[in-house]
Swiss-Prot record:
It is a multi-pass membrane protein. This is Protein translocase subunit SecY. The gene is secY. It holds the Pfam family SecY. NCBIfam families: 3a0501s007. The chain crosses the membrane at residues 25-45, 78-98, 126-146, 155-175, 184-204, 218-238, 275-295, 318-338, 376-396, 398-418. Belongs to the SecY/SEC61-alpha family. It comes from Buchnera aphidicola subsp. Baizongia pistaciae (strain Bp). Keywords: Cell membrane, Membrane, Protein transport, Translocation, Transmembrane, Transmembrane helix, Transport. The keyword tRNA processing does not apply. InterPro entries: SecY (IPR026593), SecY/SEC61-alpha (IPR002208), SecY_CS (IPR030659), SecY_dom_sf (IPR023201). The lineage of its organism: Bacteria, Pseudomonadati, Pseudomonadota, Gammaproteobacteria, Enterobacterales. It comes from the Bacteria. It is found in: Cell membrane.
Length: 441
């Protein structure tokens, strides 16, 4: 009897989470496809020569893009552009939803408006991918040392390269949307996460090899590990931190009775902007070094070499520029992601209010005041997380994958993935309880 009950419970447990397993399998399958695609080269490029040449472009935006694409750029893969055009397109459309009347109306149309906005994101992604692939293909022969990388620099090569890069980016965008729909978590974030994590084993082995050869002291290696562990704990703590604003509801009269609803909370994350500010700030400080590595040997671009010298990680200008860019993008992207006035209007329409604060404009001002404080603290936290590993990487020659931006992305994506899995498990359990008790609505 006990054995049969146990078997029945195990069977029911397996049936409850069968869909979760299918979603997990779909994510794994999609990531395998992504990794396989990152090894498909663009026809007409000597991948061995390109990989050796990119070793001289360390500390530039090229290295960061190569990290996000899982090494696809160094292999001249069809996924070389990665998912960056989609990220840029999403931010452009988010800006338009704040300033353009047509996009403002679409945002208010609910599900139908969201589908139309997603279409515009796809169109702009296609345009950006076309521009970037054209620029990358045309500029390759003009970059010092890259002439020998292209086997036959003819018109047919440029056409094939441009089409391959555009197709690769559109495929990644489609794959990311499929992961979001049929898998677990945000598909685009998981693709970026997969690209970064794919380089961790080789970076770790390279660091261990330095310890074995004596170029990196064992104590320093242990110190680096402790710092990475502590920084990871800090990221987990901050990313889970929330400022909860107590929301009360007005009493309602139903028939001859008066009912008062329980109070709830409006949770505001300390770091609402996510990892986007770190990515764009890194792009800004690395962009001059990228241009200088391409055109610095020409006479009319010599001034770029001087700028790059002052934008080295130990220089005050680098630190100031990096911190300023992070703070700016934190406030900018938080303003795009969260609208205090819209939140205040929704609270007023639902009969909710904050104790001691008048509904409407006063509530919006109160929420905005809290958001400004949280965003400032969040930007300081992000600047610290991004700068400390970067300085360690410069002074201690730690591999690029241990940088602050990559660490932040890895931890944030894992936290979001675990949260969504937990939410899915809870919703499945609630559904099973309702079915068991035959509740109907």
């Amino acid at each position: 009897m006990i054995k049969k009950k146990l078997e029945t419970k195990l069977k029911n447990f397996g049936n409850q989470f069968s869909e979760l397993k299918q979603r997990m399998y779909f994510v794994i399958f999609s990531l395998i496809v992504f990794r396989m695609g990152s090894y498909i080269p663009i026809p007409g490029i000597d991948t061995v020569a390109l990989a050796s040449l990119l070793e001289h472009h360390r500390g530039t935006i090229i290295e960061m893009f190569n990290m996000f694409s899982g090494g696809a750029l160094s292999r001249a893969s069809i996924f070389a552009l990665g998912i960056m055009p989609f990220i840029s397109s999403s931010i452009i459309v988010q800006i338009l939803t704040l300033i353009h009347p047509k996009f403002i109306e679409m945002k208010k149309d609910g599900e139908q408006g969201r589908h139309r906005i997603n279409k515009y994101i796809r169109y702009i992604t296609l345009i950006l991918a076309a521009l970037q692939s054209f620029g990358m293909s045309i500029s390759l022969p003009n970059i010092p040392g890259l002439k020998d990388v292209i086997i036959d620099p003819s018109i047919s090569f440029y056409g094939i390269a441009i089409i391959s890069l555009i197709t690769g980016t559109i495929f990644l965008m489609w794959l990311g949307e499929l992961i979001t729909e049929k898998g677990i978590g945000n598909g685009i974030s998981i693709i970026i996460f997969s690209g970064i994590v794919s380089g961790l084993p080789s970076s770790f082995l390279n660091t261990v090899e330095k310890v074995r050869q004596g170029s990196l002291h064992v104590l320093l290696f242990c110190f680096i590990g402790i710092v990475i562990f502590l920084v990871t704990l800090l990221v987990v703590y901050i990313e889970r931190s929330q400022r909860k604003i107590t929301i009360s509801y007005a009493k309602r009269n139903l028939g001859h009775r008066t009912y008062s609803m329980n109070s709830t909370h409006l949770p505001l994350k300390l770091n609402m902007s996510g990892v986007i500010p770190a990515i764009f700030a890194s792009s800004i400080v690395l962009f001059p070094a990228t241009i200088a590595s391409w055109f610095g040997n020409r006479d009319h671009f010599k001034w770029l070499v001087d700028i790059v010298f002052y934008l080295q990680p130990t220089k005050p200008l680098y630190i100031l520029t990096y911190i300023t860019a992070i703070i700016f993008f934190c406030f900018f992207y938080t303003g795009l992601a969260f609208n205090p006035r819209e939140t205040a209007d929704n609270l007023k329409k639902s009969g909710a209010f904050i104790l001691g604060i008048r509904p409407g404009e006063k509530t919006a001002q109160y929420i905005n005041k809290i958001m400004l404080r949280l965003t400032f603290l969040g930007s300081m936290y992000m600047a610290f997380i991004c700068l400390v590993p970067e300085l360690m990487r410069f002074f201690m020659d730690v591999p690029f994958y241990f940088g602050g931006t990559s660490l932040l992305i890895i931890v944030v994506v894992i936290i979001d993935f675990i949260s969504q899995v937990q939410t899915y498990i809870m919703s499945t359990q609630y559904e099973s309880v309702l079915k068991k008790n035959k509740f109907r609505f």
